[in-house]
Amino acid sequence: QTVFQNPLADPYLLGVSSGAGLGVALFILGAPLLGWSEFPLLQSMGIVGSGWIGTAVILLGVAIISRKVKNILGVLIMGVMIGYVAGAIIQILQYLSSAEQLKMFTLWSMGSLSHITTTQLGIMIPIVCIGLLISISCIKSLNLLLLGENYARTMGMNIKRSRTLIFVSTALLTGTVTAFCGPVGFIGLAVPHITRLIFNNADHRILIPGTMLTGLIGMLLCDIIAKKFLLPVNCITALLGVPVILWVIAKNLRIIK
C-alpha cells in the first residue's frame, strides 16, 4: 500500500498468489491431462512444492520487472496481467479436468491452516523469517516513500533497489503462505488498515510489527470461527475484511469531497 500509494493495494497485486495457484493447478489438473502424473519427481513434489515453484517463477519475474521498469504503475499493471493470464490457464485446466481433480483443487483454493505438517512447518518458517527480515530492513525506505518517490529520491534513496527488496519480501511471504495454506484473501488488505486504526500511526517502525501481531490474532480468530462452523477460512476472512475495505473507501471519498 505504501509503495503503490494505494490504500486498496494488497500482496496479491504482484501476481504471486496467481503463480502459486497456477503451479498447484498444473500439478492437480494438468499433470494427469498431459500424462505427467506417473513421474516420481512430480509425485514427491506434491501440492506445496508445485505451488512454491509457481511462486518462485513469479518472484523471479517480479524482481526483473521491478529493476527494469521505472514507473511503479508499470509494475502494478504487469502484476495484474500476470494474474489474468494465470487465471485464464487455470480455467482451461478446470474445464478439461475430472470431478475428483476439480474437488481437490477447489479444497486447496478455499484455504486452510490445518493441513500443514511438522515437516512442512520446518520448511515454511525459515522462508517466512527471511521475508520478514527483508521487510524490517526496508522500514526506513517505506517511511521515505510515504511522501512520494520524488522526495525519497532527493533524500538519497535508491528507488530501484528498495522497490526490488520490498517486492521480493512481499513475494516470499505471500507466495510461501499461499503455497502451504492456499490463497487466503482479505488479510493482506484489511489488516494494515486495522493496525493503523489501532495504533493511530503511519510510522513503519510501529506498523510492521503491529501488522504482524494484528494479522496473527486476526487469522487465528478467523481459523477458530471457521473450524467451529466447519466453513472455509476464506469465507470468514472475507466477511470480516469487506467491512474494513468499505470503511476505507468511504473515508477516502469523504477526503476527496
Predicted region positions:
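Alpha-helical transmembrane segments in inner-membrane proteins
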Residues: 1-257
